[in-house]
């Protein structure tokens, strides 16, 4: 039997996304040896346009040295309507890279551990493959998750705590 391909969407921005993806991968390998192959993809670095492709370097400095502007961006884009508008802009801006990701990395299951990647990547996979891969959104924030994290069209949305769910 051919192993199922699992693609993890993450970025090394310092928010624990890689650690979450690696923990899920390790658990799956332990529980289902040989059933899956795994690939971790740093979406910001490999598939987003400038200056977003620099986010792994920019983001830690931004949240530590310009926290007020980060918080403003969080608040301006949080909420159902505001996040939908922001995501529509992101989808258009990132479209080419997300299509390239879907073409270069065919998947049976896509697991997003970064809130900004779920919608644009899911949209690209839906348009580029003969079938739609299963899509799992993993919320990594324990308390105050952004609206982007809760992807309504995902097959599963895994939320770590009741506080994050509420």
Tell what function each PLM region has.
Residues 2-47, 105-108, 112-113, 130-131, ...:
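Soluble, non-transmembrane catalytic domains of enzymes that act on hydrophobic metabolites at membranes
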Residues 23-103:
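Conserved N-terminal ligand/cofactor-binding loop architecture of enzyme catalytic domains
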């Amino acid at each position: 039997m051919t192993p199922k391909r699992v693609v993890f969407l993450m970025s090394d921005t310092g928010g624990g996304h890689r650690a979450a993806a690696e923990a899920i991968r390790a658990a799956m390998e332990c529980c289902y040896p040989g059933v899956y192959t795994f690939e971790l993809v740093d979406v910001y670095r490999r598939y987003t346009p400038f200056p977003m492709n620099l986010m792994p370097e920019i983001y830690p400095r931004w949240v530590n040295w310009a926290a007020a502007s980060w918080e403003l961006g969080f608040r301006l884009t949080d909420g159902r309507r505001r996040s939908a508008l922001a995501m529509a802009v992101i989808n258009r801006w990132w479209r080419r890279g997300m299509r390239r990701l879907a073409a270069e990395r065919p998947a049976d299951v896509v697991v997003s551990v970064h809130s900004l990647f779920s919608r644009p990547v899911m949209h690209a996979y839906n348009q580029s493959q003969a079938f739609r891969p299963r899509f799992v959104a993993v919320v990594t924030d324990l308390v105050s998750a952004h609206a982007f994290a809760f992807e309504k069209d995902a097959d599963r949305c895994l939320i770590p705590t009741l506080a994050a769910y509420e």
